[in-house]
Amino acid sequence: MNRGYDSYNRSRSTSSRPLDREPYHAVSELYTKEITHTPIGPASDLPPEILDILKENPRATPQYTPPLIRHRENTWTPENYPIVRVPSAQFTDVMTELYDYHEVEKYTHRSVTPDYEPLRKEPELKEQKLPTYQVIPPTPEKNTPRHQHHSGITLSPSDSSRTLGALPKKPPMYEEYLQMQKKDENRNIPRQVSSADSQRTIRNNNELSHLRHIDSSSSSEASEPAKDLDDRERYVYTHDVYVDSTTGRPFTPGREDVREKKNCDKLKINVYFKPPHPPVEITYKLDEIEIEKNENIVVTKLRPSRSDTILSRSVSTSPSSVTDNIPKTSTSRIPSSENPKTMEHTTTSRRFPTQTSILRKEHEIVQVPLHRSQSLRQSRISEHSKRSLGKTTSTVSTERPIPIHVVEETSSIDMDVVFPKMPHHQTVTNVRVPSSRGSAISRAHSEHRRSIDRSEPRHHHRHHVHSETPELPYTRGISKTPSVREYNVKREGQRSPSRSHRSERSPSEVRIPVTTTHTRPIAKRQSPEELDYGRFADKSQQNRFPGDHQAREEDLPYTRGISKTPSNQDSRSERTPCSDIHIPYNNPEKERAYQQSERSSYRSHKSVTPSEKSLPRNSETPELHYTRGISKTPSDRVEKSRYLSRGVSTPHTPSEVHIPYNNPEKERAYQQSHRPSSPKRRPSGRTNSPNKSSSSSKARPSAAPLEEIVHIKERYERDETIRRFFPTTTAV
C-alpha cells in the first residue's frame, strides 16, 4: 500500500538537498504503538449495521475531547490494515506516546465518564520541573484491573527508576498535552539534543520495547524476560502516517486527491500486533450453543444506543476487574454469556473492559445484535451459514418455494426453525437460495433457472405437482431481484417430506423444507434473439418436455433494448398512419404512430390550415425537416430554397396555436409561427428523392449541420423503426 510513498519520501528526505525542504517539514520520528488488533474478518461478513458502527466517528462531550484528537479516526482499511492516525507534525518532538488508552475510551464513550479529580489536583503538578513524558502501558493482560494505573508509566529522567506501584496519580494524557501546548509555543522547532534528550532516545529504542510488553500489574524490570517470549508471537507493521504540515491534519496516502501533496511530513509508527489473547474465534464468533443460552433476553435489550458502553466479551473471565457506577443508560447490556450471573450486576454497575485498545471495536460485533433476524438465534458467523442467513430469511418470510436438490437431503436446513419469519430490508434485496453444502453441480445452472423463471406463467405450477420424481432445478441463487413469479406464487398446501421428520432430529441439525413445485426443466439456454424477438419459435424444441403443454413464445415478449430488427407489428403500425388523432407523447407505442403521421413535431394539428391539407403529398407520411437545434431564425436563403424545392408558390399564414411550453421543439415552432414575416416552412420528406432537394442548401452547409445531425440521431433513437438503418439523407 505504502510502497510508492516510501520511495517518494525517501527520495525527498535525502541529505543531499536538506535546504529545499518545505518550511514546515518537521523531523520525522519513530513512534511505537502497541495495538492488540483482533482482525474482524472481511468487511462483507458483517451486516451493514455493524459496519456503520465501525465507521462511525466516536462522539465525546467537547470539553473532554482533546482538540488535537477530535478529528482523527482510527480505522481499518478494507484489508484489515489499521490506520493509526497521529495528530500532527506540530507535536512530533513532544509526543513520546500520543494516547492514554483511558483517554481514548472516554473519547469514544466506551468507558467511565472522565474523572474530574485530576483537574483539582493540578496545583501539585507544578512541583515537578521536568516535563514528564508518558509511555502508556500497552494493552494490559486479562487479569489486570485497569483502574490502578490511570496515567501510565512516567518517563521523566528523574522518575525513570520508579516502579509502577509508586506512581503518583496524574491527570490523563490529553490534559497534559494541553499544558505542554501552553508551555512551549514553538513546538515545530526540533530541540537541540541535550543529555536528557539523548537519554530519552536511548530509552525509546531500548526500554520502549520492554514497555510494550508490560503486564501493568508487575514492575517494569520484571517485564524484560517476557520480551523474547512475546516477540516471536507478534508482528509489526511499520506504519507511515503522512501529516499535512500546513493544516496539521493527518491524511491517508492512498487517496488520489492527496497524491501530489508536497508539504507532507512522514511519521513512522510501529504498530505491534499481538495475536489476540483469547483466540480470535472466541472473540467474535457467535456459536449456536451460547446463543441458545441467551435466547430469553428481550429483544429491546439487545439494541444498545450507539453511544452506550460496550462490554467486552472477556469481562466475566477476569474476576479482578473492578466494577464502577455508571449512568442508567448502560442497563441495556447483554451479560456476557460465559457468566450468566453478570445479569444482575449489569443494572447497577459495569465492569471495565480489560483489554482496551485503540483499534479494537469488535466488542460491538459480539454484543450488538445483527439485525438480520431479530432473535438471537443465529448460526456461527461462518461463510456457509452467513450465506444461508442472507438468503433464506426473506425467502421463507415471503412464503416462496425453495427448490433444493433433493438428493442432498441430509445437509438441508429448515430455516423456519432457525429464523423467525422476519424479512429484513437488507436481505430482501439479496434473495438467494441457499445451496446445500456440497452441491457444486448446482452452480452451473442458476442462469438457466433465472431466465426460465421469469417467463413462466403463474398457473404453470399446478400441473405436475404429484408426479413421483419432481424435477427440481439446481440453483445456486436466483437473480438478486426476485422475479415477480416468486413473489406471487404461494407455497402449495402440502408439507414437504422433510418437514414431517422434524421430531426425529435434534434441533441443532437444521433442515430446509423442500417444496415440490414442478418447475420447468432446463431447456437449452435461450439465445438473446429468442428472448428478444421470439425469432426461432420452434414448437418441437419448446414442447418436447412431458407435461409442458403451453406454447412458450407468448411468454417471451421481451424487447430488451430497442429491437434493431423490427418485429411484424412494428412495421404494421408503421404503415397505418392515424393522421387525425393527437396522442400525447409519453406513451411510446402510440407515440411512434403519432410521429409517423405528424412527422414534424413543429406542426400541431390545429395549425394545419385547409390550404395546407390540400397540398399534394408524395407519401402518407411527410418526413420531418429536422431543425431542432438550429439557430431560431433560419436564414432567408435557406427558407426560400426550401420552398422552391417543394414547388410551393405562396407561403400561407398559419393560424395561431398555443403549444405548451415544456416541449422545446414545439415551443420554438410556436415562436416562429408568430413571426408574420416568415412563411410557414413545410418539411420536405425523404420521399422527395434527394436530387429534387435544393442545390443551394446542398452546396453549403446550413446553419449548424453538426448539431442538427446530432438531433437527427436523437430523434431516430426515439422511434424504433427501420428508418434507423437508412443513411440520414434528409435535406438539411
Curated annotation (Swiss-Prot):
Residues 117-129, 526-538, 546-557 have a biased composition (Basic and acidic residues). Disruption phenotype: RNAi-mediated knockdown results in no obvious phenotype. Residues 1-24, 115-169, 181-232, 310-351, 372-397, 426-708 are annotated as: Disordered. Expressed in intestine. Residues 312-323, 688-705 have a biased composition (Low complexity). Residues 8-17, 151-163, 189-208, 324-351, 426-439, 607-619 have a biased composition (Polar residues). PANTHER family: MUCIN-1, MUCIN-1-RELATED. Interacts with tax-6. This is Calcineurin-interacting protein 2. It comes from Caenorhabditis elegans. The gene is cnp-2.
